[in-house]
């Protein structure tokens, strides 16, 4: 696998030397880094409720992380279509450990490396692609929750227009770093259903083959429908409402789930969030998520998450940012609860808007959780912030203080 990846990278780099009349090189990326302490004693420990699929991230991230992306247009053909390649390096390292980006506390990998033939007249402006790429990633910014994500290693047709609608298909074998087995997955999407001025619906279906390499495995499927409303309520932001359902391995919803689950395993999810920029200085994002998991082995659980982040700029470059979030998981063993609050004085040299970056933040985070959450952490996440072997011991509350920089660019 390493040898084939190396050959692919060499071919991609070699293609940059081809004689072409016009080659546009684009460099984009994302970086966050910082340092923090838990209650002023020891390295920062982040708060996430066992069973919750995400956490509220402001002042609650415990890693250095970077994505560095290069995209190169190789040829523009006579029909207007474009041949391109794209590669992205990903770097990750936990706080409190030397940033080697390898070993038990860090990683370095190519999380994108693919070729694309875009704007094809034969596909009415659609594209063909092959490789490993980010694709149709739908996420909530304040919790970094990728609820519908078709990123994968495979090939696909992207947004071929037929009439008023755009059709996409992806065949993939692996859709996340944590997926151990290669499993065939098919994703079909149709978009462009106009519902109202500024509003559209996109629908996607995923089918996951039964893998022959996994004992007692099963096939599965999932469906997602999402409505996107531009300029929601005149607040200069978007609203997204997604409804999701899956069975068997399809219970991963946005991802390939456990292939040993049969069709008796089911998951439902509702995602609702919106951005707003009420004035040039006042903006934010609010979210609500509900997920119900039904398992035949008694592992049923319900997850609720409600929260929001708001920023107010006192000057063109100084913001005060606040975030509050609550997660609750109803499962065997009791109802787990976690509430978290963060306040962050922030320098924003590019302006006062909510999404303007870079930001350099000082932050204070306080969280509180109940006994059921602590007992679940003892069992499922020993040594984590909520467990009695973590940074806060037997207490069921704790705080972090630190500094962080976040920056993205295109």
Where are these regions (language model features)?
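Short sequence motifs at beta-strands and strand-loop junctions characteristic
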Residues: 58-64, 104-107, 147-149, 180-182, ...
């Amino acid at each position: 696998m390493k040898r084939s990846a190396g050959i692919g990278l060499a071919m991609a780099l070699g293609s940059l030397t081809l004689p072409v009349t016009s080659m546009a090189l684009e460099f984009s990326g994302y970086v966050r880094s910082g340092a923090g302490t838990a209650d002023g004693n020891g390295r920062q420990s982040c708060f996430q409720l066992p069973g919750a699929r995400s956490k509220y991230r402001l002042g609650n991230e415990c890693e250095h992380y970077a994505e560095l992306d290069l995209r190169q247009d190789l040829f523009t053909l006579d029909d207007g279509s474009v041949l391109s390649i794209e590669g992205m390096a990903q770097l990750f390292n936990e706080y409190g450990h030397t940033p080697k980006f390898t070993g038990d506390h860090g990683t370095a990998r190519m999380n994108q490396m693919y070729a694309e033939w875009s704007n094809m007249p034969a596909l009415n402006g659609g594209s063909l692609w092959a490789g490993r790429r980010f694709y149709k990633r739908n996420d909530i910014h304040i919790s970094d929750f990728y609820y519908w994500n078709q990123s994968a290693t495979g090939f696909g047709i992207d947004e071929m227009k037929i009439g008023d609608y755009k059709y996409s298909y992806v065949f993939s074998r692996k859709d996340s770093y944590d997926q151990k087995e290669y499993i065939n997955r098919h994703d079909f999407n149709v978009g462009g259903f106009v519902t109202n001025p500024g509003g559209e619906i996109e629908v996607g279906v995923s089918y996951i083959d039964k893998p022959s390499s996994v004992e007692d495995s099963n096939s599965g499927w999932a469906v997602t429908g999402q409505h996107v409303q531009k300029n929601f309520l005149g607040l200069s932001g978007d609203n997204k409402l997604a409804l999701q359902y899956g069975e068997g391995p399809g219970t991963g919803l946005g991802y390939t789930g456990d292939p040993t689950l049969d069709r008796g395993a089911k998951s439902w999810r509702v995602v609702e969030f919106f951005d707003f920029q009420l004035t040039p200085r006042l903006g934010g994002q609010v979210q609500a998520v509900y997920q119900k998991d039904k398992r035949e082995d008694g592992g049923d659980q319900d997850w609720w998450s409600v929260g929001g982040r708001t920023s107010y700029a006192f000057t063109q470059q100084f913001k005060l940012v606040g975030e509050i979030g609550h997660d609750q998981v109803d499962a065997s063993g009791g109802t787990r609860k976690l509430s978290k609050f963060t306040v962050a004085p922030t320098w924003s040299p590019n302006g006062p808007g909510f999404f303007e970056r870079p930001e350099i933040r000082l932050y204070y985070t306080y969280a509180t959780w109940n006994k059921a959450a602590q007992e679940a952490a003892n069992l499922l996440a020993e040594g984590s912030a909520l467990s009695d072997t973590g940074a806060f011991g037997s207490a069921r509350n704790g705080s972090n203080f630190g500094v962080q920089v976040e920056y993205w660019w295109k």
